[in-house]
Each structure stands twice: as structure tokens, then as C-alpha cells.
């Protein structure tokens, strides 16, 4: 089986056997063997050898390859969406939007590169001051499973655009999406060695992160893994590390006029992608009193009607599955743990079929829980916390080690401005779902959600480093010599 793409060639793995499964049917989608350390090293060396020629290409030449990649994605959009749905359980309508995001990433990255890391110059005395940017060299990209096409693409595209070469290790749960993506790069004419693919689980990731031949690592995934990488890179300021991690995101609800609009926005924030977006609302802060009671009652009633089903089911469901049976069981266990601590199940999250990773939306009131776990429960489980006043709501919203996303539903601009100033998050939304983000904006958080290397529109910043130069075409003595020097 040809599993890994190294130096322009597909080759079989020499490590443990890997399988990706359809989360609903448990059918095998992809199978192969992981990369061992020697294969990881070969991928890094291939990238190192390809780097000088790729970096020396003109920016326009690299853009041409990237645009051909986008064109290939358009040609294979249906197959890519099918693969994303099959491997992640995401409904086809949502998988199709992910492919569209992959395509659009190319033009957005080019615009960002020109604005943030292009070339700038100006006169300075008898010289010209020039600012240019250089690629780091060889960078590793670790991809997640929830957006197996779009999120790795958000690192790979700007990295290649800047002139870097890449070794890509996707999630072991979504290897087929990665394989299809790499095939699109090959069809686009990307030179051998510029992008290398190594499939594998933890052992492959450890080998790649520890390889001395990489100049940087771009990671999207859990805070636990991100923290381990941060510790591993401690004392290595020469290597660039960009961490995009999760959040225990709060959504604060004020007493708004349009109750159903609030309910719909909450659902889009908490349960889209079966709650498997890093920006999903995990904590819903609702005012005490009759208005808050009415909101929660309406939310529960509507959530009972949310359709859950297989990725290709017709009519299309709103929610697909979570990524695996293991993930589904962990979420059911988390709900039970919250209930044991005093949480009240307002709408119990259930797993209708023991052999399918389909979960129904869950809502649990944890107001009375004294020691609420500050964890990211990555699925359709929403915790409700009732608050006495707006300041208490903001304090509770900030009561987390994370700082990725926060939102407010309110009819008052003054309240939003007050909330915005006091909230601690990299994404702060007003009357919009937490899971909505502008492609023309940076994406990242503070605290345990990242290391101040915002991605998306700001990915260009960590894909190249600035080089400042003073330049003049001819060497000449200045009109006035420095005191104490005689020529």
C-alpha cells in the first residue's frame, strides 16, 4: 500500500497498521501502515533538499502553483466532500463548505502575504531602507480531524507561498482526506519534495516534532498535545512554533427581544459540526429569572427536533456523528460526571445506537456545580450557567484557562462594548454565532488556546521572518567623516 508521499514518490509505511473508519457504519475507509522515524527523517531531508529551488522561485511562480492547486480542488470538489463526510461523519452540505474554504484559502493567503509580508522600501539618507521576508525552511504541519482539509490547508498554503517546504502529518483519524489533498498538489505540478506526507499516530508525530531538520512546527489540535509540543520546544528559540488550540468558550445571553433568534444562534454556536469546532460554545450564560427560564425552555424544545444522521443521509441532517465511538463514549461519560457533581440534565445527550458515533444534543445546567471542570468537551454537550447580573456573567465567562472565543447576544451596543473590553479571548462576537469567523481576520486565542501566533489571515506572519536592509548601489565615503577618523 502506498501510504506516504516522500521526495515525489508514494511508498508503503513500515510502522503500525492504521485504519480510518466511517464513524456511523464502522466500515473501513482507509488502511495503511504508519511512518517510522527513518521515513519521517527521509521526508524532512527531501524537504530540505527541495527548499533552495522552491524558495528561489519568484513569488508569482509559487502563486501559479497554488492557483493550479485551487483549480484541482474545484475539479475534485465532489469527491473531496464525499471523503470528508465519510471519514469524519460530517453531513455532505457541511463537507462541501469545507472544500469551498480550502479553495478560497489560496486567494486569501496571497492577499495576506502581499499586505503583511510583502516587500516595502523607502529612502533613508543616502541609502534605501528595504523590508523583505524570508521563509524559515522546512516546517512540519500537524492537522486535526474536525476540519481535515481546511485547517491543515490554512498552514500549508501560506507556508508554501512564503517559500517554505512542508512535512505534513495529518490526524490518524482522517488519512484519506490528506491523501486526496496531496494528490491535488501533485496534479497542480508542485515539485517533488516541496510537500511531503507522513501518515501515522503518536509515534510518527513525536518523531517529526523531534526531528532536528525542521525549522518550525504549525499545530492545530488539543491543548494537551499543544502543551506537550510547547514543552518539547522549550529552549529552542531558533524554531518557530505556532499553536492553534481549543477553548472552553462562553456565550453570554442578555434579555434580547427576539427569543427565537437567540435560540437559533445558540444552536449554531453549540451544535454545528456535532459540537466539534474549537470555537463552539461550551458554556451558555443565561440570566436568572422568568426571561431566562423562557429562553432555556424554548432552546430545549427546539433542540429536541434537531436532526442527527449519517453524512449522506437524505434529507440532510443538521448534525452528523462525532469522530469515533471512543469520542462518543467519552462525551457520554463527561455528561454523567457533570450530573454526578450536581448538574441537572435539561436535555440528555444520548447515543441512539451503541455501534454508531451519533449523539443527540445535550444541555445540562451546572449552576449548582461547585467545581466545574475547565475542560473542552469536544462534542454536542452544552453547559448552562445562570447569572445574577452582567458583571457576574463576565466574571464567569472569563473563569477559564482558555481564551479562544467569547460571544454576547444583546440588544445593547453599550453592553457589548463593556463586554468586549473585559472579555479575554481572541475572537469576540456580538449577536453572531461563536463558530462564525471572517476569512479576512486573524484566528487565534490567548491563555491555553494558543501561543500568540494567530492563524488564518495572520498565518503569513509565522510563515516568514522579516529581514531589514540598508542598501545603496555604490560604495562611497560620506561627505563628512566621523570625528577621530582620518583618511
Swiss-Prot record:
Domain of life assignment: Bacteria
A Gene Ontology biological process term: arginine catabolic process to succinate
InterPro entries listed in its UniProt record: Ald_DH/histidinol_DH, Ald_DH_C, Ald_DH_CS_CYS, Ald_DH_CS_GLU, Ald_DH_N, Aldehyde_DH_dom, SuccinylGlu_semiald_DH_AstD
SUPFAM superfamilies: ALDH-like
Residues where NAD(+) binds: 221-226
Key words of the record: Arginine metabolism, NAD, Oxidoreductase
Pathway: Amino-acid degradation; L-arginine degradation via AST pathway; L-glutamate and succinate from L-arginine: step 4/5
Catalytic-site annotation from UniProt: 244, 278
Enzyme Commission number: 1.2.1.71
Catalyzed reaction equations: N-succinyl-L-glutamate 5-semialdehyde + NAD(+) + H2O = N-succinyl-L-glutamate + NADH + 2 H(+)
Keyword Amino-acid biosynthesis attributed: no
A molecular-function term among this protein's GO annotations: succinylglutamate-semialdehyde dehydrogenase activity
Family: Belongs to the aldehyde dehydrogenase family. AstD subfamily.
Listed NCBIfam families: arg_catab_astD (TIGR03240), PRK09457.1 (NF006992)
Role summary: Catalyzes the NAD-dependent reduction of succinylglutamate semialdehyde into succinylglutamate.
Protein name: N-succinylglutamate 5-semialdehyde dehydrogenase
Chain's gene name: astD
